[in-house]
Structure formats: C-alpha cells, structure tokens
UniProtKB/Swiss-Prot annotation:
Protein name: Large ribosomal subunit protein bL20c
Gene field: rpl20
Cell membrane among keywords: no
Origin: domain of life: Eukaryota
CDD domains: Ribosomal_L20
Subcellular location: Plastid, Chloroplast
Amino acid sequence: MTRVRRGYIARRRRTKIRLFAATFRGAHSRLTRAATQQKMRALVSAHRDRGKQKRDFRRLWITRINAVTRENGVCYSYSRLMHNLYKRQLLLNRKILAQIAILNKNCLHIISNEIIK
C-alpha cells in the first residue's frame, strides 16, 4: 500500500492544537503529542471545575449571609432566615441576599425583622 502524507489536513489539526496549547509551559506547548494530552486534560479540568465553581459560590454566599445574620442577632442563623423567607414567600436567592449582606447590612436587618413579625 502506498503511503499517504496527509499534508494540509494534518498540519491544520496540529496548528489548532498548538494554538490551544500556546500558553502551556515547556514541552506541553511545543510537542504535538504532549500538547494533545494536555489539551484533553485541560478540557476535563475545565468541565469539572465549572460544576465545582457553582458549588463554591453557593457555599460562599451562604457563609456571607450566615455571618451577617449572626452578627447582630437579627435572626438566629442562616437556616432560620431562609426558612422564614420561604414561609413568607419572599423570593430572594442566595446571591442577591449575599450582595445585600455585604453592601447594605441595614437592608438585610430590615428584611429579617419584617419576616420575624
């Protein structure tokens, strides 16, 4: 069988991989096999960490809300605050509550005092 050189197609594929791996360090940015493996690994990590990022932010928001609610003893804890919010049908998500807790603590105290009544 004759040898197929695949010049243009192979070069285009390798160029695409090299462009992706241009910011990698060492051989991972220069050698095609190493760059291909590193590219697959990078994509796996990116996919995994997109899910982890959602969990991390939710955890951060909960920590911030809990810190502010315990600070002045407005509500006893985060869980009671959230329970009372749902009971009163106030649809504020954790991201918004965390922003309020950081930027305007008085507003969060007003909200929680209204809920307790």
